[in-house]
From Swiss-Prot:
Name by which UniProt lists this protein: Beta-neurotoxin Css9
One CC-aspect GO term: extracellular region
Span of the signal peptide: 1-17
SMART domains named in the record: Knot1
Lineage: Eukaryota, Metazoa, Ecdysozoa, Arthropoda, Chelicerata
Family: Belongs to the long (4 C-C) scorpion toxin superfamily. Sodium channel inhibitor family. Beta subfamily.
Described function: Beta toxins bind voltage-independently at site-4 of sodium channels (Nav) and shift the voltage of activation toward more negative potentials thereby affecting sodium channel activation and promoting spontaneous and repetitive firing. This toxin compete with high affinity with 125I-Css4 bound on rat brain synaptosome and may bind with high affinity to Nav1.1/SCN1A, Nav1.2/SCN2A and Nav1.6/SCN8A.
Cited PROSITE patterns: LCN_CSAB (PS51863)
Coiled coil location: none
Free-text comment about domains: Has the structural arrangement of an alpha-helix connected to antiparallel beta-sheets by disulfide bonds (CS-alpha/beta).
C-alpha cells in the first residue's frame, strides 16, 4: 500500500511541473555563459522552480521543476526578436 501511495505521489508531482528554457520579456531564452548562480536565482527564486543552471552548449539558462504557469521557450512558438 505504501508503494502504491509513493507511485501516485510521484505521478502527481510529475504532472504539476515542467522543465525548459525560461523566457525574457522579448520571448527569448535567458542567456548565460557559465553563471549557474544567476540561472539558479531566475529559476528558483523568480519562477519558483526546483533547480536552475546554465546549459553551456546552448548558452542559456535551463530550469527544472517549474510550475505550469511559467513560460518556457518552445521552438514551435518561438517569437524571439533579438
Amino acid at each position: 500500500m505504501k508503494l502504491l501511495m509513493l507511485i501516485v505521489a510521484l505521478m502527481i508531482i510529475g504532472v504539476q511541473s515542467k522543465d525548459g528554457y525560461p523566457m525574457d520579456h522579448k520571448g527569448c531564452k535567458i542567456s548565460c555563459v557559465i553563471n549557474n548562480k544567476y540561472c539558479e536565482t531566475e529559476c528558483v527564486t523568480v519562477l519558483k522552480g526546483k533547480k536552475g543552471y546554465c546549459y553551456f552548449w546552448k548558452l542559456a539558462c535551463y530550469c527544472e521543476g517549474l510550475p505550469n504557469w511559467a513560460k518556457v521557450w518552445d521552438r514551435a512558438t518561438n517569437k524571439c526578436r533579438a
